[in-house]
Design a protein with these regions (language model features):
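Preference for the N-terminal adenyl/adenosyl cofactor-binding alpha/beta module
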Residues: 2-16, 130-371, 403, 407-416, ...
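Short, polar/flexible loop-turn hinges at active-site or ligand-entry regions and domain interfaces
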Residues: 78-82, 97-103, 122-127, 146-154, ...
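SAM-dependent methyltransferase catalytic region
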Residues: 45-57, 305-559
C-alpha cells in the first residue's frame, strides 16, 4: 500500500538532511539510491538492480548504476559532475536493453541535484537536493500514485491490440477457442492493466511469468491457472503452503476469475508474446477503449482500425453533457461554497442511476461513470477546502459502479462492459488517492454493474431496474435501415411496434425509442438520449414514428447534427 504524500514529504526532508554533505559516487551511491527508494516506501531490492551489465553498440560492456526494468534508469555521479554527460551515458545503454525492459524515465544525479527525464512525454525536471520534498510528486510512478492522461489515437492502443491479437491467434491455432478463449483473454487483459495501475504491484504479473515459467512455455499455462485461482480466493481461504510469489497477489473477487476453464497450452513463442504484452504501459490505455481493444483482439481485420469501430469520447460527451452532466456541473458551481447543500448534492450524485439498453462493451457507461466520479472529486475538494492533508477515509466516497445498468445481446461484450467499469472505478480511486495523499482502493471487489446478456427488444427493462429507481437512459443502439435488417431484427421490430401502421419503413434504432418511451411512462422524470440516424427526423419516417412517441408523452429536449 502506498505511503501518504505527507509521509513521503517527511521522508524526503530527512533524506535531504542526511545526504546534504555526500559527494562520492564510488563510496555511497548504492546507499544513497537505497535511501532514495525508501522515501517512497519501496524496497529498492524488490524492484531494481545495481550494476546491470549491458553490451553497448561498440561491443564493450557497460554497467548501469540502477535499472528498474521498463520503468527507470538511474545514472549517479559524484558532486559537481556534468549531468548532460550523465544523461548521454544513460542513453548509450539503451541499444543493449531488451525492448520490453526499456525504461520510460531516466534520473541523473550528482547528490546535490536531480534531473528527471520522462522519455514518453518529452519532459524534464531539475531540482536541488534541498528541494526534493517539493518535487516528490514527480515520482508518483515509484510511490504508486501515477495518474495518466489518455489520447484516443495513442499508438499504444494499436500496439496493444496487435500484441494481444497475436497471442489470441496462437491460442486459437492450437484449438483453444470460443467461450474459453474469450474469458482467458479478458483475464489476461485485466492482469496487464492491474500491474500498471496499482491493483497489483508494479511488474508483479510480468515477474511471475518471467521468473517462474520456463523459456519453452511448457509450464506457463499451469502457472496462469494457479494465478487465476489465487485471484478468486480470499486470503484466509488460501493454502497455507501456497507459493510465496502467488500468495502476494491480492484477492480480486468480482466473478471474473470464478469460472473453471479448460487447460490452455503455451510454447516458446506464445510465452514471449505474453511478455511482449507485459512490456507495454497499460496504464495509458483508458478503460473507455478497453471494450474496443478487446473486440479488435478477437478480429484481426479490426486491429489496424482501432478507433473506427467505437463511438469516440468526444461524441459520447456530446450526448451525456446535455443529458445530465451540464446540469449537474451548473448546480455544483451554484452551491460549492455552501457546505450543507454540497453534502446533499453529494448524496444526490450517489443516487443517480444509468441504463444503456444496447451497451456493447460499455463505452457510454464507462465515460458516464468517469464524469460522475470527476464531479464527485470536485465535491470532495470543495468540502475539504483545498487541503490535501486529511485522511481520505473520512471522505465518504459514495459513487460506485452499481449505479450502472446495461443490456447487451452478445455475451462477451457484456462481460467486458462490467470489467471496464471496474477498471475505471479503480483508476478514479487512484485519482482520489493522488488528490488527498492517501491510498484508496476497493479490493476485493464488492459491487458491480448490472449487465444483462440478452435481447433488449425482447426484455422487460423493468426486470433490470425499476423505472422509479432510474435517472437516465443512454446509448448507441444499432441503426439498420429497412434494407439491412436481419430476420430476427425484423421480428423484433414487428413485436415492438405491434399495431403501428407503416412501422416497417422505420430504421432499426427507433425500436429503442419506442421501448424507452414505454418504460419512461412509469416515471416521467427519466431522461433519455440515443445516438441515432438523422433519417428518423426527416422524410417518411417522421409521420410514422413521432405521432406514436408524442402521444406517449415524449418531448425533444436536445439534439445534435
Amino acid at each position: 500500500m502506498p505511503l501518504s504524500w505527507n509521509e513521503i514529504k517527511d521522508r524526503a526532508l530527512r533524506f535531504s538532511r542526511d545526504w546534504a554533505d555526500e559527494s562520492s559516487e564510488d563510496a555511497e551511491a548504492k546507499s544513497f539510491l537505497d535511501a532514495f527508494f525508501n522515501v517512497f516506501g519501496v524496497p529498492r531490492k524488490r524492484v531494481a538492480t545495481f550494476e546491470q551489465r549491458i553490451k553497448k553498440l561498440d561491443g564493450r560492456s557497460g554497467y548501469i548504476d540502477l535499472l528498474w526494468k521498463g520503468i527507470l534508469l538511474i545514472e549517479q555521479k559524484s558532486r559537481g559532475k556534468d549531468l548532460d554527460r550523465a544523461y548521454q551515458q544513460a542513453k548509450d545503454y539503451f541499444p543493449g536493453i531488451k525492448d520490453r525492459d526499456t525504461p520510460r524515465y531516466i534520473l541523473v544525479s550528482d547528490f546535490a541535484r536531480f534531473r528527471l527525464y520522462d522519455l514518453e512525454e518529452g519532459k524534464q525536471h531539475e531540482f536541488a537536493l534541498a528541494e526534493f520534498y517539493k518535487n516528490v510528486r514527480l515520482f508518483g510512478f515509484i510511490a504508486g500514485y501515477q495518474t495518466t492522461s489518455y489520447k484516443e489515437q495513442d499508438p499504444v492502443n494499436i500496439e496493444a491490440a496487435e500484441r494481444m491479437g497475436r497471442l489470441h491467434d496462437k491460442l486459437k491455432d492450437i484449438g483453444y477457442q470460443g467461450h474459453r478463449l474469450e474469458i482467458y483473454l479478458v483475464r489476461l487483459l485485466f492482469c496487464l492493466f492491474a500491474e500498471d495501475t496499482s491493483i497489483f504491484e508494479r511488474r508483479q504479473f510480468q515477474d511471475l511469468i518471467e521468473q517462474r515459467t520456463s523459456e519453452d512455455g511448457a509450464d506457463s499455462a499451469p502457472w496462469l491457472e494457479s494465478l487465476f485461482e489465487v485471484l478468486n480466493t480470499p486470503q484466509d481461504k488460501r493454502l497455507k503452503k501456497l507459493d510465496e510469489q502467488l500468495g502476494a497477489f491480492p484477492y480480486v473477487n468480482g466473478t471474473l476469475f470464478a469460472e473453471q476453464l479448460p487447460h490452455a497450452a503455451f510454447d516458446t513463442c506464445m510465452r514471449q508474446l505474453l511478455l511482449d504484452c507485459c512490456a507495454l504501459d497499460w496504464s495509458r490505455i483508458s478503460p473507455a477503449i478497453f471494450g474496443s481493444l478487446f473486440q479488435s483482439v478477437m478480429d484481426a481485420t479490426l486491429r489496424r482500425n482501432l478507433g473506427a469501430h467505437y463511438t469516440t469520447e468526444k461524441n459520447i460527451l456530446k450526448l451525456i453533457k446535455p443529458l445530465f452532466l451540464d446540469e449537474l456541473r451548473a448546480e455544483f458551481e451554484r452551491i460549492k461554497t455552501h457546505r450543507k447543500r454540497l453534502e446533499e448534492f453529494h448524496q444526490h450524485l450517489a443516487r443517480l442511476t444509468f441504463l444503456d439498453p444496447a451497451c456493447g462493451c460499455g463505452n457510454f457507461l464507462v465515460i458516464a461513470y468517469r464524469e460522475l466520479r470527476l464531479l464527485e472529486l470536485d465535491v470532495l475538494r470543495a468540502l475539504d477546502k483545498g487541503e490535501a492533508s486529511l485522511d481520505v477515509a473520512q471522505f465518504n466516497i459514495l459513487c460506485d459502479v452499481d449505479q450502472f445498468y446495461g443490456i447487451e445481446i452478445e455475451e462477451f461484450p457484456a462481460q467486458i462492459a462490467q470489467t471496464a467499469l471496474w477498471l475505471m472505478d479503480h483508476q478514479m480511486n487512484m485519482r482520489v488517492s493522488e488528490e488527498f495523499g492517501k491510498y484508496f482502493v476497493r479490493l476485493p471487489l464488492r459491487k458491480s454493474a448490472t449487465i444483462l446478456h440478452g435481447n433488449a427488444l425482447r426484455t422487460d427493462w423493468r426486470g433490470i431496474v425499476k423505472p422509479e429507481a432510474l435517472s437516465y437512459i443512454l446509448g448507441n443502439p444499432p441503426f439498420g435501415g429497412k434494407q439491412y435488417r436481419s430476420i430476427v431484427q425484423k421480428a423484433d421490430m414487428a413485436a415492438t411496434f405491434a399495431g403501428v401502421s407503416g412501422a416497417g419503413v422505420l430504421d432499426f434504432v427507433t425500436t429503442w425509442y419506442r421501448k424507452a418511451a414505454d418504460y419512461m411512462a412509469d416515471n416521467p422524470t427519466i431522461k433519455a438520449a440515443f445516438v441515432s440516424t438523422n433519417s428518423i427526423t426527416q422524410g417518411e419516417q417522421v409521420g410514422i414514428l413521432w405521432p406514436d412517441l408524442l402521444k406517449r408523452g415524449v418531448k425533444i429536449h436536445f439534439a445534435h447534427r
